[in-house]
Amino acid sequence: MKTIKLTLLALAVSSASGYALANGLAINEQSVSGMGTSFAGRSSSAQDASTIYGNPAGMSRLGREVSLGGAYIHAKIDIKDASGRYATGTQVPGSNDGDMVPNSVVPFGYFVTPVDDRLHFGLGVYVPYALISNYEHAFQGRYQGQASKVEVITIQPTVSYKITDKVSVGFGPTINRIEGKLNSNLTAGAFGGGDAQVKVDGDDTAYGFNVGVLADLTDDLTFGLTYHSKVSYKLKGHTEVTGAGSANPTFNALLGRLNGKYDGSLNLTLPESTDASFTYRLNNDWTLYAGATWTRWSRLQSITVENEGTPTLPAPIGNRLGEVTEEFNWKDTWSYALGAAYQLNPQWVLRAGMAIDPSPVDNADRNVRVPVGDRKTFSLGAGWSPTKEMTIDVAYAYLWEDNVKVNRAPDALRGGYNAKYDNSAHGLGAQLTYRF
């Protein structure tokens, strides 16, 4: 039954930590210089080699350089007013500790080099989607999901071309590898049995592209536009069920047929997004940034998992493992960011920014693996250049969300779960850029 959670194996891809500075399942932590301004102006400010992700056209404004870094994420999640019921109406026993997202780091790396006066080449490695969560063993909502670890790692070779001194374009194909493992429980309490354990794994490699344009509208105003394509996966993996049974010999013979390892597959498309931003150089000291990002989360309406060799049991269980459709009903979102940078002296630049990022999911469709709500982020950052060849960027960000509800109904093999989630997170990033 829990093969429905294979859907999230492809979907649940927010930081390698489960919480990040973007909403839904996306990650923003591909740049620490951008993190300091809440990623405002990401498409219009080619500050370093991380522009390979932000806007590949920005490489035309760089020399030969490498940028390496990462962001550390510490999430705080409180669960309130929780309750769980079996389909029979009896209460699901268990705890609701919260803080199920472990601390972790999101790494990235980029390299840019000129080929000639107009052509640049670059290579980037980063994480665009990820999820890690690990509820306690006795979590009351364990039938809806208990442990998740999913990552997408992207490699992006990139070229840019300077059309004029004011306009450049860039393009990069993306090679995207998705891998994940998910654990959850299913119940046979109505048949005199206890909890069974379900482990799901799957992977795939798929391809997409990023394309961008960067233009100086005036001597002080720069506009950038970046498109990140959708990526279509066909995940293949396995679902293993263990521990299904009953003290009743008749039911035990039936439920025992659920135990086994099944081949499964699903088609999944992770959405495209478009970022438009402006960078305005107010004077020699101040630079202002503004940006908006549209993400087509409405691609995630429903997903069907197909499994081979699954048993058909009498009602009410039936063949719950054969073909399972999970409804998501996500909606498109617009996120917005404003930021500023102050050049304190030739060596130091100070940054600040704020962003608002709506959730793509409503209370009716939210689940325990991705319990996200409308999000706001405030960030501070600094860049230190002790030499012309080296810059060290650091950034801190705090995000908080509107309180959200999870409402999941029970069925024959899953206990239902209802709770309120209060989510926040701290992010700390560091990045080294070296020019040579």
Predicted regions and their residues:
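Gram-negative bacterial Sec-dependent N-terminal signal peptides
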Residues: 1-22
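Outer-membrane beta-barrel porins/channels
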Residues: 21-34, 38, 86-93, 103-436
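Transmembrane beta-strand segments of Gram-negative outer membrane beta-barrel proteins
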Residues: 26-41, 60-78
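Surface-exposed strand-loop-strand hairpins of Gram-negative outer-membrane beta-barrel proteins
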Residues: 39-47, 75-102
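Outer-membrane beta-barrel pore proteins
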Residues: 40-46, 52-64, 111-118
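Long, well-ordered hydrophobic secondary-structure segments characteristic of membrane-embedded
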Residues: 68-76, 99-113
